[in-house]
């Protein structure tokens, strides 16, 4: 008779294989999170198009200001854009919008819907990301069906000034504690991304490091190159 540990290992292997059908670990290398604050006269669509041209591997639409009708319209347009580049596209927090416009998935925080409830709503084939700051949160999110974790803030960030920083030691401990991919988020830039080498993350999520730059495509290319080097180090 097989031990509980062996059964748990097989279940995790099956889960990981299923996750790989929805997305590859490499898709999380450079994860762009949109922010209307950095539009500077441009449209969100044009900004996302530029970062996709530069090689962004994953896009999250984070929208706190639009009403539902405009949010839905914008989400559908950006989903089609991401599909042209074969880049996964998820919605931040708003699971109902993700369901209605058939996004590739959703990303939720600790104060949002639990991962298993998101899974029940979106179905087995959608990507579910969960934010975590502790090993306990990370392990629980994995058990509840998360496909990947966003951990941070790893550096100080003005976009979420009230969020406590996650130490390098905690980031590494989280990566060691789970079998699903982990990305770091919060205050990451081309100047400090190399400091995350050796933690076990498979990529980074950024906002201003891409969208606050004058040349979004060039900034994306540079950051992707540096992140690739960091992950391999």
Regions found by a protein language model. Name each.
Residues 110-117, 150-159, 197-220:
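Glycine-rich phosphate-binding active-site loops on the catalytic face of alpha/beta enzymes
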Residues 167, 184-189:
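Glycine-rich adenosine-cofactor-binding loop
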Residues 2, 12-112, 121-146, 190, ...:
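Conserved N-terminal beta1-alpha1 strand-loop-helix module at the mouth
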Residues 61, 98, 155-161:
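A short acidic, helix-capping loop that chelates divalent metal ions and anchors anionic groups
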Residues 171, 192-195:
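Short glycine/proline-centered loop/turn elements that form peptide/ligand docking sites
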Residues 55, 102, 145, 153, ...:
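Conserved functional loop/turn residues at catalytic and ligand-binding sites
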Residues 73-76, 163-171:
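Charged helix-capping and loop-helix junction motifs
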């Amino acid at each position: 008779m097989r031990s509980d540990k062996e059964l748990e290992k097989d279940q995790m292997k099956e889960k990981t294989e299923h996750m790989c059908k929805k997305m590859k670990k490499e898709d999380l290398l450079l994860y762009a999170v949109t922010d209307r604050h950095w539009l500077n006269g441009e449209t969100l669509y044009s900004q996302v198009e530029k970062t996709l041209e530069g090689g962004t591997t994953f896009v999250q639409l984070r929208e706190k200001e639009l009403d539902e009708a405009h949010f839905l319209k914008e989400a559908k347009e950006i989903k089609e854009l991401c599909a042209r580049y074969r880049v996964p596209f998820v919605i931040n927090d708003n699971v109902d919008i993700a369901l209605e416009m058939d996004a590739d998935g959703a990303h939720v925080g600790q104060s949002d819907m639990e991962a298993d409830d998101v899974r029940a709503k979106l179905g087995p084939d959608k990507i579910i990301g969960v934010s975590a700051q502790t090993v306990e949160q990370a392990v629980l999110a994995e058990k509840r069906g998360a496909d990947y974790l966003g951990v941070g803030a790893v550096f100080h960030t003005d976009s979420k000034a009230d969020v406590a920083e996650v130490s390098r030691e905690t980031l590494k401990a989280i990566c060691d504690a789970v079998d699903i991919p982990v990305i770091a988020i919060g205050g990451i830039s081309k100047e400090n991304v190399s400091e995350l080498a050796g933690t076990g993350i498979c990529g980074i999520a950024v906002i201003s490091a891409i969208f606050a730059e004058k040349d979004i495509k060039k900034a994306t290319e540079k950051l992707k190159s540096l992140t690739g080097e960091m992950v391999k180090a």
